[in-house]
Amino acid sequence: AGENKDSNLITSFAKDVKIHKEGVFLKTPASPHIGKKLERLDYKAFDIALPESKNLLIETAGGLFTPLDDKHCMLDYISLNIKPCILLASYYLGCINHILLSIEALKQRQIPLLALVMSGKKDEDIDDFVFKYSGVKIVHLEHFNKENFRQKALALRRDLINVAKF
């Protein structure tokens, strides 16, 4: 939410990337159901259309249980528009719990999980436990900047192709 959009950052790093317009754009830095209310926007979660594209990366606002409107969360929307998922997480106290809950929620809805991308400085202990417990393959995305973005993006692409068998 807000004017500092991830898509603006990515576009500034990689000019050749196609960024689709948001299905809904909220300015309020809050959960979408709160932003919707504060901005007096009227939309229903299931009316948000996905763009037609051969390759499409969809970034949701927040986690799987982030409310999208007053009745539905991101997981409901993903369940309606089932696409293979890549789960993104970072290393922090409590991340194992959040990751495993997300993996279980995706399994329960029969949403294919291609890989878990862990962002930040690698923590082998966390990776080992998550992999042993869930069986989900893990790839890493180190922090990047404008100078090393293309190198990091290509490394992530290579690793995802290797584990997810695109």
Model-derived segments and their meaning:
Residues E104-F166:
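C-terminal lobe/tail of nucleotide-utilizing enzymes
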Residues L57-E59, I86-L88, V117:
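Structural motif
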Residues T66-D69, C95-H98:
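Short glycine/serine/threonine-rich phosphate/pyrophosphate-binding segments
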Residues L75-S79, N97-K107:
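Histidine-anchored nucleotide/phosphate-binding helix
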Residues A14, N81, Y133-K137:
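Short, structured coil segments at secondary-structure junctions
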Residues A1-L41:
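N-terminal phosphate/diphosphate-binding loop that engages ATP/GTP or pyrophosphate donors
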Residues S31-L68, L75-S79:
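Phosphate-binding/switch loop-helix module in NTP-utilizing enzymes
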Residues D69-Y92:
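Inter-motif core of Ras-like GTPase G domains
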